[in-house]
């Protein structure tokens, strides 16, 4: 009898332990797979592609690659003598037409004052027409001068904001054309994280929810807040034909892969360029409040580590 009772008790304890282990593993699995998190996340920042508005030889480069610069700091200079001469020529044209316009203005005024008693209507109209033509030429000369002055100012390529110069591809003596990208500027204090979450996990993601960001290869966790969720993603199965009609590919796959939706996360504190734009991270959306890891069980902590390093 005692042996039977002992066997039953042993079996019951074993079954209970197996059930508890199964429940714990199942909850950890659900926590790992169903909760909103992703390893497909990247640090990003506002990046300005800097291109000159004038063409010419680069006469001076004032910065180095990956240097931190301030707003309006001169990055490099394009051949200025040519644009200085163009401005001087434009200013000479303005001075010439100003003098000519003054002469024609006096002449037209004199003829209009004398009137048709002293000369013909045709001569009066001719003087007025010449004055209008010269004033038009003066306006064009002023516009050309202003444009030449603007071109001269833009021979100095300046930083549009505080940030880091990166991918600097300009050298003294090199010819650069207008509109060709010469350098990229990563704006300071504009870093954020773009997390690509599966559509099956979006139910637990809302703007304002808290997030934990763990950079790849780092044990440091950064706090952030969900800023926005993308309103749409590209449909790879659909396109338009030559007549503009929708063309949908046949899709009978047995396995349906969840689409990934971009979620923008605002960092609580800017980290400088400690994690450059484009580097990867793991993101966990913790809900309306930050996660209290002290209450997590062993399996949940194991899942957290798998997320960060798995």
Swiss-Prot record:
<dbReference type="InterPro" id="IPR032317">
    <property type="entry name" value="CusB_D23"/>
</dbReference>
<dbReference type="GO" id="GO:0005886">
    <property type="term" value="C:plasma membrane"/>
</dbReference>
<protein>
    <recommendedName>
        <fullName>p-hydroxybenzoic acid efflux pump subunit AaeA</fullName>
    </recommendedName>
</protein>
<keyword id="KW-0813">Transport</keyword>
<dbReference type="InterPro" id="IPR022871">
    <property type="entry name" value="PHBA_efflux_pump_AaeA"/>
</dbReference>
<keyword id="KW-0812">Transmembrane</keyword>
<comment type="similarity">
    <text>Belongs to the membrane fusion protein (MFP) (TC 8.A.1) family.</text>
</comment>
<dbReference type="Pfam" id="PF00529">
    <property type="entry name" value="CusB_dom_1"/>
</dbReference>
<keyword id="KW-0997">Cell inner membrane</keyword>
<dbReference type="Pfam" id="PF16576">
    <property type="entry name" value="HlyD_D23"/>
</dbReference>
<dbReference type="GO" id="GO:0022857">
    <property type="term" value="F:transmembrane transporter activity"/>
</dbReference>
<feature type="transmembrane region" description="Helical">
    <location>
        <begin position="12"/>
        <end position="32"/>
    </location>
</feature>
<keyword id="KW-0472">Membrane</keyword>
<comment type="function">
    <text>Forms an efflux pump with AaeB.</text>
</comment>
<keyword id="KW-1003">Cell membrane</keyword>
<keyword id="KW-1133">Transmembrane helix</keyword>
<dbReference type="InterPro" id="IPR050393">
    <property type="entry name" value="MFP_Efflux_Pump"/>
</dbReference>
<dbReference type="InterPro" id="IPR043602">
    <property type="entry name" value="CusB-like_dom_1"/>
</dbReference>
<dbReference type="InterPro" id="IPR006143">
    <property type="entry name" value="RND_pump_MFP"/>
</dbReference>
